[in-house]
C-alpha cells in the first residue's frame, strides 16, 4: 500500500508529547482559509515557487517542477508530494527512535488530512504501534466514522 506524503518534519516539540517526527500527508477535503499547511491541501504532487527566496541564478531556467526543485540553491522551488510505501516510511522515521524513547515522544500523523488516505494512515499507525512508538493523529475530523473506529 502506498501513500502520498507532503513532507516529514523532525525534532518537533509542538505536535504532542516529547520530541516527535511529524508526517504531513498530502490531501485534505477542506479548503480552510486559515490552513497552516496549504501545500498539503491538494491530493496531487505539486511544485511551489517562492519568489521572495529566488536569487535569479538561472539554474532552473524558469522551469519549476520535481526535477528542478532539488537543484535550487536557496529552496525557492520546493516539490510537495512523495510516494511512500508503509515499510519505507516507517524505516525512515525509525531513525529518530532514540529521540522518541529518551523524551517520551513519537510520531504525529498530520496533513492535509492524514485520514483522507485512510488505509495508508491506519497501516502506518499500526506499524509504529507494533514497534512501541507513540502515535498521535492530527485530524480535522471530516472523515467517515468507520475510519475513526480503526
Can you name each region flagged by the protein language model?
Residues 42-149:
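Conserved Radical SAM active-site core
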Residues 5-59:
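N-terminal pre-triad scaffold of radical SAM enzymes
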Residues 1:
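Iron-sulfur (Fe-S) cluster-binding modules
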Amino acid at each position: 500500500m502506498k501513500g502520498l506524503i507532503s513532507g516529514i518534519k523532525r525534532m518537533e516539540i509542538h505536535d504532542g508529547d516529547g520530541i516527535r517526527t511529524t508526517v504531513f500527508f498530502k490531501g485534505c477535503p477542506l479548503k480552510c482559509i486559515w490552513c497552516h499547511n496549504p501545500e498539503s491541501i491538494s491530493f496531487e504532487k505539486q511544485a511551489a515557487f517562492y519568489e521572495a527566496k529566488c536569487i535569479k541564478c538561472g539554474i532552473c531556467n524558469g522551469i519549476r517542477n520535481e526535477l528542478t526543485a532539488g537543484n535550487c540553491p536557496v529552496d525557492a522551488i520546493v516539490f510537495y508530494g512523495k510516494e511512500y510505501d508503509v515499510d519505507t516510511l516507517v524505516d525512515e522515521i525509525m531513525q529518530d527512535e532514540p529521540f522518541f524513547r529518551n523524551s517520551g515522544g513519537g510520531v504525529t500523523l498530520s496533513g492535509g488530512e492524514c485520514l483522507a488516505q485512510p488505509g495508508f494512515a491506519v497501516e502506518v499507525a499500526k506499524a509504529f504501534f507494533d514497534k512501541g512508538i507513540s502515535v498521535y493523529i492530527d485530524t480535522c475530523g471530516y472523515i467517515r466514522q468507520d475510519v475513526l473506529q480503526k
